[in-house]
């Protein structure tokens, strides 16, 4: 896999059931996403910011690299992905999963990983 160009807005790159921005300030933002059982946030990383995932409803599976791990989260649980660490987010259950993503501190970018 190789890096693609970094983008400032990833909302058009993958489909979700629902997406809402709860707060956005320079260097920090909070988003809420709802993904269906077959949906995912594709492999990507951020150069400057960390992602903190917090599950509200359903189950979430997060796959990360360097080192390779699989994290399973249920409501009330959270996980932090450091800057530069590639990750993939999938629904870990049979129903929709709703979660918050706290992103910061720094300038937002989304670098998708693509197959060679």
Describe these PLM feature segments.
Residues 48, 67, 94-95:
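Short strand-connecting beta-turns/loops that link adjacent beta-strands
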Residues 43, 62-63, 81, 87-93:
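Short beta-strand His + acidic residue motifs that chelate non-heme Fe in jelly-roll/DSBH
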Residues 1-29, 42-43, 112-116:
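A short, N-terminal "cap"/entry segment at the start of jelly-roll beta-barrel domains
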Residues 67-83:
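Short acidic-glycine-tyrosine-enriched beta hairpin
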Residues 31-46:
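Conserved short histidine dyad/triad with adjacent acidic residue
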Residues 48-50, 54-60:
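Glycine- and acidic-residue-biased ligand/ion/polar-headgroup-sensing regions
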Residues 95-110:
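A short hydrophobic beta-strand segment most commonly corresponding to one strand
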